[in-house]
Amino acid sequence: MALARAVVRIESNWKTHLTGRAGEVGLMQIKHQTARGQGYGGSRAALYDPETNIKWGMRYLAGAYRLAGGDTCGTVMRYQGGHGARRMSATARAYCSKARTLMASN
């Protein structure tokens, strides 16, 4: 749960109607295409609903967690860069550092 809260804080700072530069939406900044890949059948606009956004964002985060074998940095690397991400970029390292800091403060 601490990791999920950290991801929401990093991605949107709890702003439900935020839109990212690459089309990410809502609290967890999930892309419509990504949610559809997880089985979502609704509209892009519906992903702004906090409950919907968290449901599908958490599904994606859980997949990243499984692929990373539970490793925090591997999880956020795959959440941010896609489930197929294999290399820890400088951006992913910074994201991991932020997530760890936020998790420690909860």
Predicted stretch roles:
Residues 1-106:
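Catalytic glycan-binding domains that act on GlcNAc-containing polysaccharides
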